[in-house]
């Protein structure tokens, strides 16, 4: 009973975090076009990706038109993976910087234009680890395996919460700075308006005095 409860808890937590750290996509790309996919990754997180151009005719080799170039970069412009004129490939690295990482695909230019179908699987954190490779020989080892996976999942959730808190603080600081600038701009606008109104008043007063209206 305990083992079933533990397994259920593990699965629920694992599914909860999987939606945030895993992308399995299928998309289309025309010849000569570029499409980018982003993933928000925190520093020191392991990330792996695998991409494949779908062969329209599996009985024959892929045509030359079904080639792509890919470049994976961080928000700071650092390149973590680059490949030219390939049908498939994979990448794996540990993120040094926190932020949005971009995987940009470019289909080779071809006339007439063709449409490529691409399968892309991008996993980060717990999902990047191949848990299926762990051998299980007895009930004790099964429980140990589940506990390890649960610990990894909880740690990943904990790190994700701290990361989101840091991003929230950054946004709050940005909002405070923006509000402060807007306040100073409002005061400056008010000062300019009062100055212009004062100059208009002096000008009109002088004008009417010369005309002996007042």
Curated annotation (Swiss-Prot):
Short motif (COPII vesicle coat-binding): ranges: 207-208
Motif (COPI vesicle coat-binding): 207-214
Example of a GO biological process term: protein transport
Lumenal face of the membrane: 25-181
Record keywords, A-Z: Coiled coil, Endoplasmic reticulum, ER-Golgi transport, Golgi apparatus, Membrane, Methylation, Protein transport, Signal, Transmembrane, Transmembrane helix, Transport
Its membrane topology: Single-pass type I membrane protein
GO CC terms of this entry: endoplasmic reticulum membrane; Golgi cisterna membrane
Omega-N-methylated arginine modification, residue list: 167
Transmembrane found in the keyword field: yes
Coiled coil: 164-177
Pfam families cross-referenced by the UniProt entry: EMP24_GP25L
Signal peptide feature range: 1-24
Domain of life: Eukaryota
Domain GOLD: 34-149
PROSITE patterns, per database record: GOLD
Residues exposed to the Cytoplasmic side: 203-214
Residues passing through the membrane, by range: 182-202
Family annotation (InterPro entries): Emp24-like, GOLD_dom
Stated role: Involved in vesicular protein trafficking. Mainly functions in the early secretory pathway. Thought to act as cargo receptor at the lumenal side for incorporation of secretory cargo molecules into transport vesicles and to be involved in vesicle coat formation at the cytoplasmic side.
Quaternary structure and interacting proteins, as annotated: Probably oligomerizes with other members of the EMP24/GP25L family. Associates with the COPI vesicle coat (coatomer). Associates with the COPII vesicle coat (coatomer).
Record family assignment: Belongs to the EMP24/GP25L family.
Protein name in UniProt: Transmembrane emp24 domain-containing protein p24delta9
